Amino acid sequence: MSKKILTYIICFIASLACSKYSSGNDMDGNFGYISKPSTILYIYGGKNEEDYLGKLNASKYDSESIWNEYGKYGNKYNSKSIWNAYGKYGNKYNSYSPFNEHGSNPPVLRDKNGKFYGYFTANKYKSKRANYDLIDVICENYEEIREDVGDWYDKIF
């Protein structure tokens, strides 16, 4: 094999290892780059999207953020919080919960103008599922996240 081809192969492999799409976490539990929406997304749940559930990717200091443990939507005891294990949207067995792997009525993600960005769901077979690493990280770790939302915000963002 020529040096030029070998160099290209090595560069290609190195670029894959450093890819911005790598979503693994480091030894401290911090996540590398994960794909996140570039615009703030609002979560709506319920049969007709009648329940506002907070902002998916806002700062943990935003009062409407799901990452603000002192706010309505980041508090694991609030009925409109996805972190409430006993609530409609946080119980993994409820069809309206994003954490139900077979859920048929998961929350939707919309921007401030109402544009649809997909379903927020652990159900990987749901048509029009939101395709962000952030969704995967949340759905795979929600039980741990709900115990320390602020710390997880720091790990992810």
Where are these regions (language model features)?
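Positively charged n-region of N-terminal signal peptides that target proteins for export
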Residues: 1-5
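Hydrophobic h-region of N-terminal signal peptides that target proteins for export
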Residues: 11-19
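Repetitive, compositionally biased segments used for assembly/scaffolding
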Residues: 21-157
